[in-house]
Amino acid sequence: MATFLERYQAGDHLAVWDELMALGEGVRSEHCYADALAVAAETMRRARHNVELLIQRLDAKGYRFRDRVSSAEEKISRLDVMDQMSAQFETMAKRTPTSYNIHSMKMLETMQAMKAKVAPLLEKVAANAAKEAAAKRKPPLEDPYVFSPPDAETPGLLERLEKAAGGPVPLSLRAWYEQVGGVSLMGSDPALNPVDFSNRNVLQQFQSLVKGAVPIPSPGEECAPDPLVIYPLDALMEDLLDEDSEESDDGDELQLVISPDDLHKANISGDAYYITLPDAGADFKFDDWHKDRFVNYLRKVFQWGGFPGWARSKNPPGKELAELSEGLLPL
C-alpha cells in the first residue's frame, strides 16, 4: 500500500491532505507521524520554490517591494505627515469659532505636549530611518524584510514556541518555518498592488476632514490584493512575549498574529490574521477572509500569483497574474 508521501508525490495532493486532516490528533500516532511529517515537508519545499520564483519574477517586473530601504523611507514620510498634520491642526484651532476655540486649543496643547515628550525618540527614529533609507538596496531574496529563510535558530525557536503554547504546532506550520520562513510580498505596483505607502493619503484625508469634506474612494479601492505575508518565526516569538505580559481570557489557548490582514496590507486601518495554539492537527484554519486551511490558503496564493485578494475583483490584472503563476508547483 502506498504511503501518504508516495501518493502526494504522485499528484494526489488534495486527497492526501484531506485524509491527514481527518485523522485529527491521530496524525501524530506512531504508525503515521513520520509519513505525515514528510508530506508536510514536501509541501513546503514546493511552497518555498514558488515563493522564491514569485519574488524573482516580481523583481524582474520592477515591483517595488516594501523592503528595508522603502520601509525606512515610509517612516520618514510618516514623521513628515505628523508634522504637517500638527501644523494644520494648529491653524484650524486658531480659526475655530470662539465657542469651540477653548476645546480646540486644549486639544492642541495636549498634542504639542505629547510631541515634546516623544521628541527625543522621534529624532532617534528619524536618524535611524535616514541611515537605512540611504543604504544600498539589497536584492529582495537577500532582504529580510522580504524573505527570511530558516536558519540555525529555527529548531530552538519552534521548541520554545511549543513549550510556551503548552502543546504542539500544526505539522503544516512547523514545516513552513523549517522549509520557508518569513515572507512578505507587500509593496506597490500600478497593476498588481496599487498601494501608496507614502502616507500622503493620510494627510489628504486629514485635510478633507479639516475642510468638512468626505473623502471619496478611488475606483478599484473595493479590492485589496492581499499579497502573501507570513511573519518570521522570531516575530511570532516577540508576539508571544507580549502575550505573556498580558492576562489572557482564553484559558490554555494562545492566539498569535501570523500576518497583517488584507486591509492592513493595503495601508488602510485593518486587523490581522491569527493562529490559535496548541494545535496537534496536520493543518490549521488560516484566519483570513477565505476561512480555509493554511495549505488551501497557500494554493490560492500561488493560483493568484501571490495576490489572492484579486479573486474578489471583477477586473483583476489577468495578464500580470498569469505571468506570475505560470509553472508554479502544485501543493
Question: How does the language model describe each region?
Answer:
Residues 1-159, 178-331:
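A C-terminal-region feature
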Residues 170-180:
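Short hydrophobic alpha-helical segments that form membrane-spanning helices or hydrophobic packing faces
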